[in-house]
Amino acid sequence: GSDEQKDKWLPQLAKGKKVGCFGLTESHGGSDPTNMKTHAKKDGDDWILNGSKMWITNGSIADVCVVWAMTDEGVKGFLVEKEMPGFNAQEIHNKFSLRASVTAALFFDNVRIPSSNVLPGIVGMKGPLSCLSQARYGISWGVIGAAQACLEEALNYSNERVLFNKPVS
């Protein structure tokens, strides 16, 4: 972000006084962000944002969202503030996993974004993808940890279980 964007958001985010989220995934695209449908069109000094994002961690409690959208120039990042007219975040309930994580769908209906809320110097997929490798490591480590715990529980159970007066394992 610009120095002004960093000054406005980073201190409050670091103190936990504000919450942010990262909006890249779309319901039809999943892990293929190059198939992005969310788009922004220049309108004077502002941008008009339309589309939606899905499975966004902290989306319904975020004060600011980094949202990636297709423009005539390519993909750009926009800072969408929760009180902007036309922005709506809906929490997703009854998930199969990650139930302790607040997850939401984000909707943009002619959201007017000032040029001061556009991430500078980033056009194309390099911006959003530069963040994803580290995030994906975190997800994979969690899955590996859960799988390891399941294996250990199964082994412990099979070592303790007795059927027909004989140990199962």
Language-model features, listed with the residues they occupy:
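N-terminal glycine-rich flavin-associated loop
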Residues: 1-4, 30-33
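Short glycine/proline-enriched turns and hinge-like loops at secondary-structure junctions
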Residues: 32-34, 45, 58-62, 99-101, ...
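A structural signal for short hydrophobic beta-strand segments in well-ordered beta-sheet cores
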Residues: 38-41
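A short core secondary-structure module
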Residues: 50-90
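Glycine-rich beta->alpha junctions and the first turn(s) of the following alpha-helix
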Residues: 88-169
